[in-house]
Amino acid sequence: MINRRDFLQTSALGAGAMALFGTSAYAAELQEADELPSEILSLRSRVEEAPPPISESERDERRERAQSLMDEHGIDALFIEPGASLTYFAGLRWGRSERTFGLLLPRRGDAVVVCPAFERERAAKQVDGRFEIRTWEEDESPFALIGDLMRSWGTGSGRLAFDEATRHFIVHGVSRDAPSLELVSGDPVTHGCRGRRTA
């Protein structure tokens, strides 16, 4: 029996194939009819000129740069929710929901992914062994988990920064469940990294 996800994927692929086939057939008809200007007909594909994908070593350098900026600004850790910054620093693409998911990057050491327990397997496929994954159950607080991780790094009363795209309920939850932390803006770190080109 086909499940909903497989059905949607198959439908999307079929629709995409039909759209491509229809477009290709239409373009061929126009080309045969000499209705396209010569400038259009002379265009060539530039796929081979596309820049290479971001390597993991480059992402390592980005995280190291972030840690250097954290040191400079007295920030002990940076929490990054799903979005452009999570992709930039970790190569992770994750949809947002009401359940907290993100990357906790300490000033020194390796980043940790904070993830709902039921999503662990899916997260592990993307993480691919690059980061430790720490999970929280439905009856537990992800914000307390963030505080616990900070304590395990010896920064239980340190400064925790948030990426500018972090939603209010997460910042509020951490302030409630890990009150010993000082919560600050992560802009000096994220802007300091993302505001400069590395390639």
Region spans (language model):
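A general structural motif
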Residues: 100, 110, 155-159
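N-terminal secretory signal peptides and thylakoid transit peptides that target proteins
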Residues: 1-15
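Mature N-terminal segment immediately following signal peptide/propeptide cleavage
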Residues: 53-81
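Flexible, acidic/His-enriched mid-domain "rim/lid" segments that flank
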Residues: 12-16, 21, 29-46, 58, ...
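Short internal beta-strands
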Residues: 102-106, 112-116
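Glycine-rich loop at the start of a catalytic domain that most often binds anionic cofactors/ligands
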Residues: 88-100, 104
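Short, basic, glycine/proline-bearing loop/turn elements
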Residues: 47-54, 131-132
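Short acidic-hydrophobic, aromatic-tinged amphipathic segments that line or gate anion-handling sites
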Residues: 132-139
